[in-house]
Amino acid sequence: MEGGVAEADVSAFRECLSLSWKNPFVLRLALSAGIGGFLFGYDTGVISGALLYIRDDFKEVDTKTWLQEAIVSMALAGAIIGAAVGGWINDRFGRKKSIVVADTLFFIGSIVMASAMNPATLIVGRVFVGLGVGMASMASPLYISEASPTRVRGALVSLNGLLITGGQFLSYLINLAFTTVPGTWRWMLGVAAVPALTQVILMALLPESPRWLFRKGREEEAKEILRKIYPPEHVEDEINALKESVEMEVREAAGSDKVSIMKLLKTKTVRRGLYAGMGLQIFQQFVGINTVMYYSPTIVQLAGFASNRVALLLSLITAGLNAFGSILSIYFIDKTGRRKLVLLSLCGVVVSLVVLTVVFHETTTHSPMVSTIETSHFNNTCPGYTRATNPSQWDCMTCLKASPECGFCASRANKLLPGACLISNERTEEECNKEEREWYSRGCPSKYGWLALIGLALYIIFFSPGMGTVPWVVNSEIYPLRYRGICGGIASTSNWVSNLIVAQSFLSLTQAIGTSSTFMIFIFITVAAIIFVIIFVPETKGLPIEQVENMLQTRSLNFKFWQTSPQSAQVPDQKHQSV
């Protein structure tokens, strides 16, 4: 009924496609609002490629790891604020106006970034974009949910998620398209202004959410919109259902004025639900997904691929697999169950992280040696190499670690043969490239680089259908109805904060302890996540909220995660009940 988000399955998506001729108004509404999800994905994905060229234009960014992390992570800081403020704006001014405000922030941020003359201005633009991301992450799915027919609501809300991953994939394509255009990263970051402006125009032609209008006492406007959304024979039933649902919400809100965090934690079902919901959101980030999404081209370069363009091209694999995994999750999440799917996902993530750890260990311990003859061929030797007491023992990694000012020019005959350790600047890079040599300033030439690509691909293949989707689904099912808003907000905030911590620390960790050791940390965290899921996360597939509450109240360990839970088995026919 009205107010709940029905689960999306394959049949719902087939019916969703039929809207293109049955009710194009609903599809136009969902796609127009879904541009917010697309912008969310684009602006979080585009920085991974743009960062490669920002480093080339701003020397201080190239030499200061914390500045690179700040450019990436300040959008996340903005998103935390945007999500917090967005909830109030959604309720006070409506879903439609919230989306337009988010678009305005996207537009301003894109223009500021595209015209930035220094890193500080670039960071300001990233904060603006982050504010838009935070608001869009709440407003777009909420608008789609409240203005969609019940039977296809789950599919249309899932469409927003697909547009997020689609936006990330397109950002990699656009990054690749602008690699040979003067201004490179300015175009990459500025392009987001176009869909933002497009959405403002489209939203001006669409109505407000009927649920919000009902809550504000504007019932006639809401009824008029519902007549456009539903077939004539269903309109009156939906109007009555919406009215009852809103009245119930108002009553529950009136009884929830004095809810505090301490009161929540004293309630066993809520406390255990928060353990599961928050834990899944935190582990989703701490197993390293956004190091792959934000720094994928950089990771590819660390694996031994020198060219920015090649790094972007190879990173398309991860973005494409992420989008594909989101589609797969629609099928597997109901066939497999939440708990089993997330455990299988995490086990696969462990395997892929082991591959990455081994590959980067081999890459760093078997890098090409530095040749005195090759180095003396150029006139700008790295000062550290000149002062070294044992230059004959230097290899490529020693050269790169000696100073951010040093780089490695590979041998022309074979990049795995001894090369030159030189001062890293544009002139040196040009001289190196003129002699048909490859220039390395991030990673070193390696015969194992292609294995790193396999590791990244495996990571996304295992992560996306399970850990990419399940935390959000479980958080929509596990809390008592009265506390769902506040608990969902707490869990969502924990996700953004964890995301910020990982994004702000990844490059610093790789510099301090090495890339292989950094991925090893993610292995330990993922193993901890597996143990956490076994102990704290129940199976919520197909359970009504009353059954979920009872299960949390009497929770006991079930190590046989591959078996269907007793509660789930008891209610197979209740799968589509509102939770």
Over which residues does each language-model region extend?
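Alpha-helical transmembrane bundle of multi-pass membrane proteins
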Residues: 1-230, 247-579
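Short, well-structured alpha-helical segments
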Residues: 235-247
